[in-house]
Amino acid sequence: MSELRVAVLGVGVMGADHVARITSRISGARVSVVNDYVTEKAEQIASEVDGCRAVVDPLDAIADPEVDAVVLATPGSTHEKQLLACLDHRKPVMCEKPLTTDVFTSLEIARREAELECPLIQVGFMRRFDDEYMRLKALLDGGELGQPLVMHCVHRNPGVPSYFDSSLIVKDSLVHEVDVTRYLFGEEIASVQIVRPVSNPAAPEGVIDPQIAILRTVSGRHVDVELFVTTGVAYEVRTEVVGERGSAMIGLDVGLIRKSAPGTWGGLIAPGFRERFGRAYDTEIQRWVDAVRAGTNIDGPTAWDGYAAAAVCAAGVESLESGLPVPVHLAERPDRSTIRPR
C-alpha cells in the first residue's frame, strides 16, 4: 500500500497530538481529514497540515474516499456509532479508550467485528507499547521471576477535569491497570473490589478520591491498585510484580528495577501522561500504521480487549457503591472462524 491516508476524528488534546504525531514522526501515513464538533478547531488544525481538510460530519469523514483508516479520539459516547460506520465501510480504526461507554454496546461491537473476514478495530491501551511495560512483559514471559503471584500498582494524577466523578476514576483511570493486568498475566479478571479510604480534603465535593481497587484473576493472582487523581503533584504510574523468585518494578523514571538484582533509585516524576507515555503513543501509532499497510490491520489490543476492560470496570463501578467484591461476567468470546463473514 502507498501512504496511508488517515482521518482523525476529535482534535482535542489527544486528537491534536495524534495529528502532530502522524504528520511529523510517523512514516507511511499522512492526515488527510480531520473532524471535531468544534468546527473552528478542526479547520484550524487542517490549515496547519499539508493536504488536509476539515469535514463537518464524522460519519462523512469515515466514508470519505480519501480516507483509508481512522483514528477515533472523540468522546466515548460517540464511539459506538462511529465504530459501526468504520466496520460498514471496512476501514481500519485506532479507537482511543473506551471502546464504548457500556458493556452491552462494547460486546456488540466485538461481535459485529468478528462477523467480518478480518479484524479492523484496535483499542488505544498505549501502555502495551511503553518500553518499560514491554520489558516487564518479556521478563515475565521468560520465567525469570518464576510464577507471578501479586502485582502492586499506583496511578496518580495531579488533577482531573471539573466533570470528573467517582465512577470515572474507575472507568477512565483504573481501566489502564485492568488492561495491564490482562496483558502482563495473560488471563482474565474474575472479580473486582473498590475500597474507599479517607477522602482527600482537596478532592472536588462528592468525588471519592483516593480509591483502592483489588482485582483477582481467574487463576487467583491478586492485584492492588492505588488510584489517586487529585494529588496536586504530578503524573505517577508504577507497577510492581512479585514472583516466586523475586520482583520487578517499573515507573520510577529510571527503567525497570529488579529487587533480586542491583538497581538504582531516583529520577523525576512526569508532569503529565503525554510526557510519561509520549514514546509509547508514537510506537503504538507507527505499529498500527504498519499493520494496516501490511493488510493485518491491527497490532495491539483488540475489540475484545476493549469489551473485557469495560466489563471489569462495570463491576468496579458496582463495587464502588457496595464496597463488596463483584464478579466479572464475560460473554463467550466471538470466534471469527465459526462465524460466516458478512
Swiss-Prot record:
Gene3D superfamilies: Dihydrodipicolinate Reductase, domain 2 (3.30.360.10), NAD(P)-binding Rossmann-like Domain (3.40.50.720). It catalyses: myo-inositol + NAD(+) = scyllo-inosose + NADH + H(+). One of its GO terms (biological process) is inositol catabolic process. It is an enzyme of class 1 (oxidoreductase). Its EC number is 1.1.1.18. Pfam families: GFO_IDH_MocA, GFO_IDH_MocA_C. The keyword Zinc-finger does not apply. InterPro entries: Gfo-Idh-MocA_inositol_DH (IPR050424), Gfo/Idh/MocA-like_OxRdtase_C (IPR004104), Gfo/Idh/MocA-like_OxRdtase_N (IPR000683), MI/DCI_dehydrogenase (IPR023794), NAD(P)-bd_dom_sf (IPR036291). Disulfide bonds: none annotated. Keywords: NAD, Oxidoreductase. One of its GO terms (molecular function) is inositol 2-dehydrogenase (NAD+) activity. HAMAP family: IolG (MF_01671). Homotetramer. Involved in the oxidation of myo-inositol (MI) to 2-keto-myo-inositol (2KMI or 2-inosose). Belongs to the Gfo/Idh/MocA family. This is Inositol 2-dehydrogenase 2. It comes from Mycolicibacterium vanbaalenii (strain DSM 7251 / JCM 13017 / BCRC 16820 / KCTC 9966 / NRRL B-24157 / PYR-1) (Mycobacterium vanbaalenii).
